[in-house]
UniProtKB/Swiss-Prot annotation:
The lineage of its organism: Eukaryota, Metazoa, Chordata, Craniata, Vertebrata. Has antimicrobial activity. It comes from Cruziohyla calcarifer. This is Cruzioseptin-14. The keyword rRNA-binding does not apply. InterPro entries: Dermaseptin_dom (IPR022731).
Amino acid sequence: GFLDIVLHVGLAAGKAALNAVNEAVNQ
């Protein structure tokens, strides 16, 4: 359903954000 899509996109965005933070911290 629509909420499943929203949840999936939200999780993907969250993972990408955490990844970006980790990269920034590592540099």
